[in-house]
Amino acid sequence: MNKTNPTIALVAGEVSGDILGAGLIRQLKAHYPNARFIGIAGTRMLAEGCKTLVDMEELSVMGLAEILKHLPRLLKIRKNVIQTMLQEKPDVYIGIDAPDFNLDVELKLKANGIKTIHYVSPSVWAWRQNRIHKIAKATHQVLAFLPFEKAFYDKFNVPCRFIGHTMADAIPLKPNRAEACQMLQIDPAQRYLAILVGSRGSEVEFLAEPFLKTALLLKEQFPDLQFLVPLVNEKRRIQFEAIKAKIAPNLDLHLIDGNARQAMIAADATLLASGTAALEAMLCKSPMVVGYRMKPLTYFLAKRLVKTDYISLPNLLANEMLVPEMIQEECTPELLAEKLSAYLSDDESAVKNRHILIQHFTDLHQKIQCNADKQAAQAVIDLLEGTENV
């Protein structure tokens, strides 16, 4: 490797990966001003100077049916990436998330003597644990956002570095509620519940009804309570409004385009689907209840496949039931309202418990606030310069 101008390959498959890739490139350019960056990039990575083989949108497919429909094209892109990398011989290949695409590329490149890093651990600790063996064969190192992920890799002697979470870097330890209310143009003197029904159509389909019915119950109990409903895009908004027209036509809601983070900071509590949103709510210091429903067959299979005691990231990080998880038959308006009312109550013990929970959230935030972009870049530098065992 030329010490001053390495060729660094990065492949991102969706917007979240493009954001990570851009942050990583920025840090690597500070160390290697003349480095060359190639791969599959979105607009942010392109702006940082990465050359792309194809438009990143070509890889952004969700759901089994969609993947099957686009499979020939995806396989063609993967073949093209492998051939290009074997010709270019980059000093390192960094697969950013998109494990179903990237791990096969990494496997081929590592077998041909190219150093590989997988950035963002697949959820092997939760399900399909046998993937760990493929990851071990495919990568020289995994970069993990969360400490329990590294602990899992350590058990299998797979090189892994905990780098902290970029979201923990982006959100202050003490979020500014007044600022969030101002951004959303809402009255800071009011009390709010944030309701996040998920970003996928299937989540809105299963969760909008119980979440709206929960809001109706809470409105009876707390007449002054207002509701903030951030929706990820126009499609989800139309879907949600159609369900609301049937379930709660007279319920006043603040429907918000995006801005989930500001909604959670402004709110006194949050009702949400599981997923990254639960981690974000924790970082926003918003007491939360996690509710989730899926098709009975999906739930039956998931229960047998998932190997963890908890499903939400705050509970996984704390390794205890910090926040209620109301899954499937427990995801009822009555139970959700009961759990949320404990956060919204003014009585002394409820206020004290809320303070204790927020302190837990702050402690966990500090644990994963490590300047992840910089840590990721350092891991790449160590691998390139031979200070990391390969």
UniProtKB/Swiss-Prot annotation:
Cellular component GO terms held in the UniProt record: membrane
Transmembrane segments: none
Alphabetized InterPro entries for the sequence: Glyco_trans_19
Name of the top EC class for this enzyme: transferase
Molecular functions per Gene Ontology: lipid-A-disaccharide synthase activity; phospholipid binding
Keywords noted in UniProt: Glycosyltransferase, Lipid A biosynthesis, Lipid biosynthesis, Lipid metabolism, Transferase
Reactions this protein catalyses: a lipid X + a UDP-2-N,3-O-bis[(3R)-3-hydroxyacyl]-alpha-D-glucosamine = a lipid A disaccharide + UDP + H(+)
Annotated Pfam families: LpxB (PF02684)
Catalytic activity, EC: 2.4.1.182
SUPFAM superfamilies xref list: UDP-Glycosyltransferase/glycogen phosphorylase (SSF53756)
Presence of keyword Ion transport: no
Keyword Lipid biosynthesis among UniProt keywords: yes
Domain of life of the native organism: Bacteria
Function: Condensation of UDP-2,3-diacylglucosamine and 2,3-diacylglucosamine-1-phosphate to form lipid A disaccharide, a precursor of lipid A, a phosphorylated glycolipid that anchors the lipopolysaccharide to the outer membrane of the cell.
Membership in a protein family: Belongs to the LpxB family.
Protein name stated in the entry: Lipid-A-disaccharide synthase
